[in-house]
Protein backbone atom coordinates (compact mmCIF):
# COMPACT_ATOMS: atom_id res chain seq x y z
CA UNK A 1 0.00 0.00 0.00
CA UNK A 2 2.84 2.38 0.84
CA UNK A 3 4.43 1.77 -2.56
CA UNK A 4 1.07 2.45 -4.18
CA UNK A 5 0.88 5.93 -2.60
CA UNK A 6 4.48 6.67 -3.55
CA UNK A 7 3.65 5.81 -7.14
CA UNK A 8 0.58 8.07 -7.09
CA UNK A 9 2.64 10.95 -5.72
CA UNK A 10 5.24 10.44 -8.44
CA UNK A 11 2.51 10.51 -11.11
CA UNK A 12 1.09 13.70 -9.56
CA UNK A 13 4.47 15.44 -9.82
CA UNK A 14 4.92 14.20 -13.34
CA UNK A 15 1.52 15.45 -14.48
CA UNK A 16 1.16 18.69 -12.55
CA UNK A 17 4.69 19.84 -12.03
CA UNK A 18 7.11 19.90 -9.17
CA UNK A 19 5.83 22.05 -6.32
CA UNK A 20 9.08 21.99 -4.34
CA UNK A 21 9.99 25.25 -2.67
CA UNK A 22 11.99 27.66 -4.80
CA UNK A 23 14.34 30.47 -3.82
CA UNK A 24 14.58 33.82 -5.62
CA UNK A 25 16.75 36.91 -5.61
CA UNK A 26 16.04 40.24 -7.29
CA UNK A 27 13.32 42.89 -7.22
CA UNK A 28 10.33 44.22 -9.13
CA UNK A 29 9.33 47.87 -9.12
CA UNK A 30 6.40 50.11 -10.02
CA UNK A 31 7.45 53.52 -11.28
CA UNK A 32 5.91 56.44 -13.19
CA UNK A 33 5.79 55.99 -16.95
CA UNK A 34 7.01 59.56 -17.30
CA UNK A 35 9.51 61.48 -15.21
CA UNK A 36 8.42 62.70 -11.81
CA UNK A 37 6.04 61.50 -9.15
CA UNK A 38 3.55 64.37 -9.30
CA UNK A 39 0.53 64.59 -11.59
CA UNK A 40 -2.46 66.87 -11.87
CA UNK A 41 -5.92 66.58 -13.34
CA UNK A 42 -9.21 68.44 -13.12
CA UNK A 43 -12.93 67.83 -13.07
CA UNK A 44 -13.33 68.04 -16.83
CA UNK A 45 -11.82 64.57 -17.18
CA UNK A 46 -14.37 61.99 -18.39
CA UNK A 47 -15.46 59.09 -16.20
CA UNK A 48 -13.39 55.89 -16.44
CA UNK A 49 -10.36 57.73 -17.81
CA UNK A 50 -6.69 57.02 -17.25
CA UNK A 51 -4.99 59.77 -15.25
CA UNK A 52 -1.42 58.53 -15.51
CA UNK A 53 0.70 55.66 -16.83
CA UNK A 54 3.03 53.49 -14.74
CA UNK A 55 5.42 50.64 -15.46
CA UNK A 56 5.95 47.30 -13.74
CA UNK A 57 9.58 46.38 -14.39
CA UNK A 58 12.54 44.44 -13.05
CA UNK A 59 14.73 46.72 -10.96
CA UNK A 60 17.31 44.06 -10.00
CA UNK A 61 18.05 40.85 -11.89
CA UNK A 62 15.74 38.08 -10.72
CA UNK A 63 17.14 34.56 -10.38
CA UNK A 64 14.86 31.76 -9.16
CA UNK A 65 14.97 28.03 -8.76
CA UNK A 66 12.63 26.55 -11.33
CA UNK A 67 9.51 25.53 -9.45
CA UNK A 68 7.56 23.60 -12.09
CA UNK A 69 8.08 20.76 -14.55
CA UNK A 70 6.41 20.04 -17.86
CA UNK A 71 5.36 16.73 -19.39
CA UNK A 72 8.74 16.57 -21.06
CA UNK A 73 10.53 16.90 -17.72
CA UNK A 74 11.85 20.39 -18.50
CA UNK A 75 11.97 22.73 -15.54
CA UNK A 76 10.47 26.21 -15.82
CA UNK A 77 9.06 29.14 -13.87
CA UNK A 78 6.60 32.00 -14.38
CA UNK A 79 6.68 35.43 -12.75
CA UNK A 80 3.51 36.52 -11.00
CA UNK A 81 2.33 39.56 -9.07
CA UNK A 82 0.37 38.89 -5.90
CA UNK A 83 -1.70 41.75 -4.52
CA UNK A 84 -2.07 41.93 -0.75
CA UNK A 85 -4.62 44.73 -0.89
CA UNK A 86 -8.06 44.82 -2.46
CA UNK A 87 -8.88 41.98 -4.80
CA UNK A 88 -9.05 42.79 -8.45
CA UNK A 89 -12.23 43.59 -10.33
CA UNK A 90 -12.82 42.65 -13.94
CA UNK A 91 -13.82 45.62 -16.10
CA UNK A 92 -15.81 44.58 -19.13
CA UNK A 93 -13.65 44.99 -22.21
CA UNK A 94 -11.06 47.03 -20.34
CA UNK A 95 -8.88 44.68 -18.32
CA UNK A 96 -8.85 44.44 -14.53
CA UNK A 97 -8.48 46.96 -11.72
CA UNK A 98 -7.23 47.05 -8.14
CA UNK A 99 -8.70 49.75 -5.91
CA UNK A 100 -6.23 52.20 -4.39
CA UNK A 101 -6.22 53.96 -1.03
CA UNK A 102 -8.23 56.82 -2.61
CA UNK A 103 -11.88 56.12 -3.35
CA UNK A 104 -12.61 56.42 -7.05
CA UNK A 105 -9.02 55.79 -8.14
CA UNK A 106 -7.87 52.31 -9.11
CA UNK A 107 -4.92 50.62 -10.76
CA UNK A 108 -5.82 49.17 -14.14
CA UNK A 109 -4.10 46.34 -15.96
CA UNK A 110 -5.13 46.42 -19.63
CA UNK A 111 -6.56 43.52 -21.57
CA UNK A 112 -4.31 40.62 -22.50
CA UNK A 113 -2.71 39.92 -19.11
CA UNK A 114 -3.70 36.54 -17.61
CA UNK A 115 -5.07 36.93 -14.10
CA UNK A 116 -6.88 35.17 -11.28
CA UNK A 117 -8.92 37.76 -9.40
CA UNK A 118 -9.97 35.54 -6.51
CA UNK A 119 -6.31 35.06 -5.61
CA UNK A 120 -5.27 38.63 -6.48
CA UNK A 121 -2.81 37.10 -8.91
CA UNK A 122 -1.45 38.58 -12.17
CA UNK A 123 0.71 36.61 -14.60
CA UNK A 124 3.58 38.89 -15.59
CA UNK A 125 5.09 36.64 -18.22
CA UNK A 126 5.03 33.33 -20.03
CA UNK A 127 6.94 30.18 -19.25
CA UNK A 128 10.70 30.56 -18.99
CA UNK A 129 12.85 27.43 -18.91
CA UNK A 130 15.68 26.80 -16.49
CA UNK A 131 19.35 26.58 -17.36
CA UNK A 132 21.46 23.48 -16.69
CA UNK A 133 21.70 24.47 -13.04
CA UNK A 134 17.93 24.60 -12.62
CA UNK A 135 17.90 28.40 -12.44
CA UNK A 136 15.55 30.78 -14.27
CA UNK A 137 16.78 34.34 -14.85
CA UNK A 138 14.99 37.58 -15.75
CA UNK A 139 17.17 40.60 -16.51
CA UNK A 140 16.25 44.30 -16.19
CA UNK A 141 14.50 45.45 -19.35
CA UNK A 142 13.24 41.95 -20.11
CA UNK A 143 9.83 42.50 -18.52
CA UNK A 144 7.75 45.64 -18.91
CA UNK A 145 4.03 46.00 -18.25
CA UNK A 146 2.07 49.23 -18.54
CA UNK A 147 -0.56 49.87 -15.90
CA UNK A 148 -2.72 52.94 -15.44
CA UNK A 149 -4.27 54.95 -12.65
CA UNK A 150 -7.96 55.19 -13.50
CA UNK A 151 -10.64 57.59 -12.20
CA UNK A 152 -14.31 56.65 -11.92
CA UNK A 153 -17.49 58.20 -10.57
CA UNK A 154 -16.68 57.19 -6.98
CA UNK A 155 -14.08 59.95 -6.82
CA UNK A 156 -15.11 63.03 -4.81
CA UNK A 157 -15.13 65.95 -7.24
CA UNK A 158 -16.62 68.46 -4.82
CA UNK A 159 -13.46 70.39 -3.96
CA UNK A 160 -9.91 71.06 -5.04
CA UNK A 161 -7.17 69.32 -3.13
CA UNK A 162 -3.90 67.45 -3.16
CA UNK A 163 -3.47 63.85 -2.10
CA UNK A 164 -1.20 60.82 -2.39
CA UNK A 165 -2.00 57.52 -4.06
CA UNK A 166 -0.20 54.39 -2.89
CA UNK A 167 1.09 51.86 -5.37
CA UNK A 168 -0.32 48.35 -5.57
CA UNK A 169 0.62 46.60 -2.36
CA UNK A 170 1.93 43.09 -2.72
CA UNK A 171 4.92 41.14 -3.96
CA UNK A 172 6.31 39.25 -6.86
CA UNK A 173 6.27 35.48 -6.85
CA UNK A 174 6.15 32.34 -8.95
CA UNK A 175 3.23 30.49 -10.46
CA UNK A 176 3.99 27.13 -8.86
CA UNK A 177 5.48 28.00 -5.49
CA UNK A 178 3.20 30.73 -4.13
CA UNK A 179 5.36 31.12 -1.02
CA UNK A 180 8.25 32.70 -2.95
CA UNK A 181 8.64 36.40 -2.19
CA UNK A 182 10.15 38.77 -4.74
CA UNK A 183 10.07 42.30 -3.30
CA UNK A 184 7.84 44.78 -5.13
CA UNK A 185 9.26 48.28 -4.78
CA UNK A 186 6.97 51.29 -5.06
CA UNK A 187 5.98 54.43 -3.25
CA UNK A 188 3.12 56.86 -2.99
CA UNK A 189 2.56 59.26 -5.86
CA UNK A 190 1.39 62.82 -5.34
CA UNK A 191 -1.56 64.32 -7.18
CA UNK A 192 -3.04 67.77 -7.29
CA UNK A 193 -6.67 68.00 -8.33
CA UNK A 194 -8.60 71.14 -9.21
CA UNK A 195 -12.37 71.26 -9.55
CA UNK A 196 -12.62 73.59 -12.50
CA UNK A 197 -15.95 74.13 -14.16
CA UNK A 198 -16.48 74.65 -17.84
CA UNK A 199 -19.64 76.73 -17.75
CA UNK A 200 -21.76 78.94 -19.92
CA UNK A 201 -24.50 81.12 -18.56
CA UNK A 202 -27.18 81.73 -21.15
CA UNK A 203 -29.94 84.30 -21.09
CA UNK A 204 -31.98 86.34 -23.52
CA UNK A 205 -29.95 87.89 -26.30
CA UNK A 206 -31.81 91.13 -25.71
CA UNK A 207 -34.04 92.78 -23.16
CA UNK A 208 -36.62 94.80 -25.03
CA UNK A 209 -38.10 97.97 -23.54
CA UNK A 210 -39.88 99.25 -26.65
CA UNK A 211 -43.24 99.27 -24.83
CA UNK A 212 -42.04 101.40 -21.93
CA UNK A 213 -43.87 104.72 -21.41
CA UNK A 214 -42.82 107.83 -19.56
CA UNK A 215 -45.24 107.12 -16.73
CA UNK A 216 -43.88 103.62 -16.38
CA UNK A 217 -40.39 105.01 -16.00
CA UNK A 218 -41.46 107.56 -13.41
CA UNK A 219 -43.24 104.89 -11.39
CA UNK A 220 -40.21 102.69 -11.54
CA UNK A 221 -42.38 99.62 -12.04
CA UNK A 222 -41.30 98.44 -15.46
CA UNK A 223 -39.37 95.23 -15.47
CA UNK A 224 -38.41 92.36 -17.71
CA UNK A 225 -37.70 88.79 -16.75
CA UNK A 226 -34.06 87.91 -17.10
CA UNK A 227 -33.81 84.15 -16.66
CA UNK A 228 -30.21 83.00 -16.73
CA UNK A 229 -29.54 79.31 -17.27
CA UNK A 230 -26.36 77.70 -15.96
CA UNK A 231 -24.93 74.96 -18.18
CA UNK A 232 -21.86 73.56 -16.47
CA UNK A 233 -19.60 70.60 -17.08
CA UNK A 234 -18.21 70.02 -13.63
CA UNK A 235 -18.06 66.85 -11.55
CA UNK A 236 -19.16 68.22 -8.19
CA UNK A 237 -22.61 67.73 -6.70
CA UNK A 238 -23.23 71.46 -7.01
CA UNK A 239 -21.26 74.46 -8.06
CA UNK A 240 -21.01 77.73 -6.20
CA UNK A 241 -20.42 80.54 -8.65
CA UNK A 242 -19.51 84.19 -8.59
CA UNK A 243 -21.37 86.32 -11.10
CA UNK A 244 -19.82 89.53 -12.27
CA UNK A 245 -22.21 91.64 -14.30
CA UNK A 246 -20.46 93.89 -16.76
CA UNK A 247 -22.60 95.97 -19.12
CA UNK A 248 -20.93 96.36 -22.46
CA UNK A 249 -21.31 100.10 -22.26
CA UNK A 250 -18.04 101.63 -21.14
CA UNK A 251 -19.42 104.67 -19.30
CA UNK A 252 -20.97 102.75 -16.43
CA UNK A 253 -21.02 103.61 -12.75
CA UNK A 254 -22.57 101.84 -9.77
CA UNK A 255 -23.70 102.80 -6.29
CA UNK A 256 -24.13 100.84 -3.11
CA UNK A 257 -27.84 100.29 -3.71
CA UNK A 258 -27.09 98.06 -6.63
CA UNK A 259 -28.20 100.51 -9.30
CA UNK A 260 -26.05 101.20 -12.30
CA UNK A 261 -26.41 103.56 -15.22
CA UNK A 262 -25.92 102.96 -18.91
CA UNK A 263 -26.14 105.80 -21.38
CA UNK A 264 -27.80 105.41 -24.73
CA UNK A 265 -29.40 107.75 -27.25
CA UNK A 266 -32.36 108.30 -24.94
CA UNK A 267 -30.19 109.62 -22.15
CA UNK A 268 -29.16 108.22 -18.81
CA UNK A 269 -31.30 105.25 -17.83
CA UNK A 270 -31.26 103.41 -14.54
CA UNK A 271 -31.50 99.64 -14.23
CA UNK A 272 -31.84 97.57 -11.09
CA UNK A 273 -31.13 93.86 -10.93
CA UNK A 274 -32.98 91.85 -8.28
CA UNK A 275 -33.82 88.29 -7.43
CA UNK A 276 -37.34 87.45 -8.52
CA UNK A 277 -39.91 87.87 -5.72
CA UNK A 278 -37.36 89.86 -3.74
CA UNK A 279 -37.37 93.64 -3.90
CA UNK A 280 -33.89 94.04 -2.50
CA UNK A 281 -31.32 95.01 -5.06
CA UNK A 282 -28.31 92.85 -5.73
CA UNK A 283 -25.16 94.94 -5.34
CA UNK A 284 -23.69 95.41 -8.77
CA UNK A 285 -20.55 97.16 -7.64
CA UNK A 286 -19.36 93.82 -6.23
CA UNK A 287 -19.52 90.22 -7.34
CA UNK A 288 -23.00 88.82 -6.94
CA UNK A 289 -22.15 85.96 -4.61
CA UNK A 290 -25.23 83.79 -4.91
CA UNK A 291 -23.69 80.91 -3.02
CA UNK A 292 -22.51 83.04 -0.09
CA UNK A 293 -24.97 85.89 0.26
CA UNK A 294 -28.16 84.31 -1.00
CA UNK A 295 -27.58 80.67 -0.09
CA UNK A 296 -28.25 79.40 -3.59
CA UNK A 297 -26.45 76.43 -5.07
CA UNK A 298 -26.34 76.46 -8.83
CA UNK A 299 -26.71 72.98 -10.28
CA UNK A 300 -26.15 72.09 -13.88
CA UNK A 301 -29.18 73.11 -15.91
CA UNK A 302 -30.79 75.27 -13.22
CA UNK A 303 -32.46 78.51 -14.21
CA UNK A 304 -31.68 81.59 -12.11
CA UNK A 305 -34.74 83.86 -12.10
CA UNK A 306 -33.75 87.54 -12.04
CA UNK A 307 -35.53 90.76 -12.84
CA UNK A 308 -34.13 93.70 -14.74
CA UNK A 309 -36.15 96.73 -13.67
CA UNK A 310 -36.13 100.00 -15.58
CA UNK A 311 -36.31 102.92 -13.15
CA UNK A 312 -36.38 106.69 -13.37
CA UNK A 313 -33.28 108.05 -15.02
CA UNK A 314 -33.17 111.64 -16.20
CA UNK A 315 -36.89 111.77 -16.92
CA UNK A 316 -36.65 111.06 -20.61
CA UNK A 317 -38.68 108.40 -22.34
CA UNK A 318 -36.94 105.06 -22.19
CA UNK A 319 -37.35 103.24 -25.45
CA UNK A 320 -35.29 100.81 -27.43
CA UNK A 321 -33.61 97.69 -26.22
CA UNK A 322 -30.44 96.50 -24.57
CA UNK A 323 -28.69 93.90 -26.67
CA UNK A 324 -26.39 91.25 -25.26
CA UNK A 325 -26.71 92.98 -21.94
CA UNK A 326 -24.60 90.74 -19.74
CA UNK A 327 -21.10 89.41 -19.88
CA UNK A 328 -20.67 86.84 -17.15
CA UNK A 329 -17.52 85.48 -15.58
CA UNK A 330 -17.59 82.49 -13.25
CA UNK A 331 -15.21 80.73 -10.95
CA UNK A 332 -15.39 77.87 -8.51
CA UNK A 333 -15.69 78.95 -4.88
Curated annotation (Swiss-Prot):
It comes from the Bacteria. The keyword Electron transport does not apply. It is found in: Fimbrium. Keywords: Disulfide bond, Fimbrium, Plasmid, Signal. GO terms for cellular component: pilus. Residues 1-22 form the signal peptide. The keyword Signal applies. Three disulfide bonds are present. InterPro entries: Adhesion_dom_sf (IPR008966). Minor component of K99 fimbriae. Is not required for binding of K99 fimbriae to the ganglioside receptor. May play a role in initiation, elongation and flexibility of the fimbriae. Requires the FanE protein for its stability. This is Protein FanF. It comes from Escherichia coli. The gene is fanF.
